[in-house]
Amino acid sequence: MASTHQDNVVFEVNAIGWAPSGTGTALSLHHEDPARLPTAAVGHGHRPSGRYVVAAGRADEEDGLCQVITPGALKPRVTYRVAGWISVASGEVAEEDGKQQRGHPIRVSIRVDDGSCVVDGGAVCPQPGRWAEIKGAFRLRENPRSAAVHVHGPPAGVDVKVMDLRIIATDRKARFRHLKDKTDKVRKRDVVLKLGGAPGASVRVVQLDNGFPLGSCINGEVIQNPAFVDFFTNHLDWAVFENELKWYWTEAQRGQLNYADADRLLDFCDRTGKPARGHCIFWAVDGDVQQWIKDIGGDRDQLMAAVQQRIRGLLGRYAGRFPHYDVNNEMLHGRFFRDRLGDDVAALMFREAAQLDPGAALFVNDYNVECGNDPNATPDKYIDLIRGLQRGGAQVGGIGLQGHVTNPVGVVICDALDKLSATDLPVWITELDVGEPDEALRADDLEVVLREAYAHPAVQGVVLWGFMQGHMWRQDAALVNADGTVNDAGQRFIELRREWTSDARGRLDGDGQFKFRGFHGTYVAQVTTAAGKMLKAFTVDKGDAPLVLDMMDI
């Protein structure tokens, strides 16, 4: 996907400027016909040149290629993209966890001030003999005295190939201008209100709710905090329970069920009128499985019985209460149940959940898919996972992108969303938080993610993974300070909500019509004539054609 604007390439690696890293590493220059190379270029207009460098004879994972970055090229507080193409020699096969997997993770690092600080610049896992586009990002806090880019990562003996590596300063303002135009097409619609016989009457249209929900996780502690409840009820639409629905919480000890905490949170959601996502039925990562489940993990029959009892117990109790469920959390990063019960158990979880609560949308949910720098969690791997579940009869109803982001780059997020949209499944950002100590930069980072999500037609909602200092899983991510004051990031969030809310006023024209363009959602219109005032509620749904409403019929 080509960018709609030209970002600033601050450093372009010279193919002959590479130096070997490691005493045994040898570099050589090569050329390949560009017509045979991939043409994708995420967020920049450059295509592969065909000129690349091979690093052979590597004796260690840290060995590879390095090149000094032009002094003064990198500035603090600027978000940089790392772009280019990386490969490994044909025939190389990686081995991970005892299973043969094609490809090796290759990492790009920015080593600052003679290596005293190493900044992650992204990673890819190319298939041998094929090129993969790197989509990393980084940001520096201070002006560096020196900086160098290093490419490394695979085991000793694996030859690394690098082509057209660039460091690009992102232009967020230009990107935001593009996204505002895109948002107008994706999230708004022309509306015509008709009231015959009353030309010149005064009209006021107010949007009550946006059709794009924004939510937050909650827990039993924060709902006792008045400042939290005030921000949540005034600025957020949905909820998700931080821990209280997870299996390790509802059944920490075998047979000792605790649904009281989840029930209290559901009561809170009912009182405040907020739907809640069901997170999660299972968790695929070994470290997030409670001990008694691990203890029976070697007994297939016992473990399968526990899995089925969990599904029946949870969904039998709460059928119809949660519009969404994350079924088996983080399957790109964990295989606890599949390794012990077979790959089909993941689809079985979906099949049985669908039978018990057919009205709920059943989600996959994982992290790093949107950031472009986790070789285990690429959009392509996520799509492969989803297709495999569907072949097994799983009724996958949605895609969850957790959104635990650092230094987000809009075009990389958009590229992931574009790829996932090919599944025709709705996408939600399910656990958004932005880690950044500087509140002004945190606000900018938050805006990057929210604008990309809101402007993309595949995304149907965003849920924050908390927002209040002292009550979040992640440090330096709050929108509201511990004393209840709203910080820069929180103000930015409120401003975006205000920007995405329509308000129109004017008069009926000579044909008795009032026209406006508004965001999808629910509205009330007040028409004032000589005979008095009329209030009418209506909904603006998605659609390309203008929505024409006769005020006497609504």
Sequence positions of predicted segments:
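A short, solvent-exposed beta-strand micro-motif common in secreted/extracellular proteins
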Residues: 521-531
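Extracellular and organelle-lumenal recognition/adhesion modules and their flexible linkers in secreted
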Residues: 1-217, 222, 226-230, 234-235, ...
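Structured interaction patches on ligand/partner-binding surfaces of diverse proteins
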Residues: 143, 531-554
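Short, acidic/polar
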Residues: 220-233, 304-314, 376-389, 413, ...
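Short, surface-exposed beta-strand/beta-hairpin micro-motifs centered on an aromatic residue
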Residues: 509-518
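Substrate-binding cleft and catalytic face of glycoside hydrolase catalytic domains
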Residues: 238-252, 261-370
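Beta-strand-rich domain onsets/edges
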Residues: 168-220, 247-250, 263, 293-295, ...
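Glycoside hydrolase catalytic-domain groove-lining segments
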Residues: 258-275, 338-365, 376-441, 450-460, ...
